[in-house]
Amino acid sequence: MAAEGRCDGQTVRRNFQSSDGVRLSFLEAGVEHAAEETTTIAFITGWSMPASLWQKQLAELSPSFYALALDPRGQGESEVPTFGYTAERRATDIHEFLKPFSKVILVGWSLGAIESLQYIQMFGTDRLAGLVLVDSSVGEEPAPGPGGEGGFLKELRKDRDKALTQFIHAIFKTKRSNADLDELVRGAQRLALNDSIALLSYPFPRTHWREITHGFTKPLLYVVTPQFESQAHNLQKNRPGTQIEVFRSAGHALFVDEPERFNRLIEKFAKGLP
């Protein structure tokens, strides 16, 4: 893996090449812990979003942990190829990202959560110490309401710029600067429309994700906003031992809206691992 440069006093950006020849970028912090027997925390971001959204997690967790955040293909600072926008390929990218590490807590947000589940289904759990799923459906009841994702796809096809702008403004409840929001919109526009839609159209039934989640035998933390609260309680009932946490005042990007609370939760989860 090649270093590209420092992003701030703690965080370094690096790149590696996937097995299908794509340059993938990631952020790392706490590199002094990399050679130790400490836990590695790896963050997988959501649809169209960059790894830099995890900046406060990298900064605040790196004094105790080796922390990494991946820019998936087509997102952030990673290359934007014309291929590979399937659950299987994105899970393979995660597998190749995690190859150098062991005792990993994998933290997946939104689309990154189901791609983390696909990684587990394809490659197993040998490298994982625990799993954190953040504000994503996991196939439990109740299913998301009608018109949600399908309606959004229609809006994307109709007026992509407007749909992206509305989506990005809606995922935060804390105030973000217009410059920051505009930068996120521009970043999301790097990916071709059809490829961005493909990422929201994985051809799996809801039971696929539920079965993977139920079959995961290591510690699991499910962190949600109220939209998934009922799923969280059902997962805890159907998969005893699941830890859940509800962020009632945060937006979909809850780790950005309430970083201190989220970081304490991750640190507590990590320190409680067997």
Give residue spans per PLM region.
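Conserved HGGG/HGGXW glycine-rich cap/lid loop of the alpha/beta-hydrolase fold
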Residues: 22-79
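Conserved acidic catalytic loop of the alpha/beta-hydrolase fold
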Residues: 88-104
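Short beta-strand immediately N-terminal to the catalytic nucleophile in serine-hydrolase-like folds
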Residues: 106-108, 134
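Gly/Ala-rich beta-loop-alpha elbow adjacent to hydrolase catalytic centers
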Residues: 108-116
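Flexible "cap/lid" loop of the alpha/beta hydrolase fold
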Residues: 117-160
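Conserved alpha/beta-hydrolase catalytic His-Asp/Glu region
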Residues: 142-147, 157-215
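Conserved serine/cysteine hydrolase catalytic core
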Residues: 193-246
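Catalytic histidine-centered segment of alpha/beta-hydrolase-like enzymes
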Residues: 250-263
